[in-house]
Amino acid sequence: MIRTPRHSVITSFLSRTKDRFHEYNEPKTLAERLRMVAAMEGIDGVEAVFPYEVGEASEFRQAMDANGLRVAAINVNVKAEPEFRNGGLTSTDAAVRAKAVRFIKEAKDYAHAVGGDKVTCCPLGDGYEFNFHCDYGEAWRHLVETLGEAGSHRPEIPLFVEYKPSETRGRCFVDNAAKALCLLNDIGVPEMGITLDFGHSMYGNENPAEVVSLLAASPYDYYVHINDNDGRWDWDYMVATRHFLDYVEFLYYLQETGYDDYLTSDTSPTRWDIKGTFEANARVTNRIWEKLGALDRDRFRRLIAARDYLATWRFVEKEILAL
């Protein structure tokens, strides 16, 4: 029997957010956000952003316990400081790089203090916009050195690197799964992993299900963010709203590879009810998950292995789409 997945929410999306044109939702304290998550059906975890949203470790842990919640991950922000604007981990200034490394190390210490088992980091400020904008080799060496130093600190709390094609930079240095794996191979710290965000993979022109297989075959762990978009930008829509069958295949391969960590909603409820948005993510995901778990898996595997797609499509029509 395949266990129903565990769900968590990134706390940033539970309060006021903004884009270039509008602000959305009302600001909330961390305590209010945690109470909101506790009231969400099917969700029992949070990914909290360090150092801006968490407060003292003892107070955070007490609030989590009071609401019956668990820490899915601590998300360390290495882009928001003014000196990180042009890159923190890859800055040409050694002092700036050292500060970014310190942020990650302190996030690991914080995760340990609050009962978390991982830190995830998306180095969005590290990238470039133009031809001849930077020395690519130097930037890569800085990534290897800085993330390697941070990853080696407190190895019992693994550091997961999240890749993304762009934003805040025109092109992020760590912009796809293959490059993220190359980075970890160069770093050589076994207690590291990769955060796979479904939407980042989609608008990066990857197939998220294929990426799951790639990461599962690697020596590194992986951790999952769920959402959707139009394939052109990281809109962070609700799951399966734009890429239904891609999401179904993604969940199928999570099952096939034995993924048993949190599915964390990295979803932005701008114009939609916050609680309803995240409950929809959990509800739809669980229903698809259960549907996949009830399939004749041996038959489905044989069909996929035979590569006769018309036969496979008939199976999908009947058993998954119920057409």
Residue ranges of each PLM-predicted region?
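Histidine-acidic metal/acid-base catalytic patches
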Residues: 1-42, 109, 117, 148, ...
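Active-site acidic/histidine proton-transfer and metal-coordination neighborhood
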Residues: 3, 83-193, 314-322
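Glycine-rich, proline-tolerant flexible connector loops at the mouths of alpha/beta enzymes
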Residues: 44-65, 123, 127-131
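Conserved beta-strand positions in the central sheet of alpha/beta enzyme cores
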Residues: 45-47, 73, 120, 160, ...
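Residues that line or immediately flank small-molecule/substrate-binding pockets and catalytic motifs
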Residues: 50-53, 78, 123, 228, ...
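Anion (oxyanion) recognition and catalysis
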Residues: 65, 112, 255
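Short glycine-enriched loops at secondary-structure junctions
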Residues: 74-80
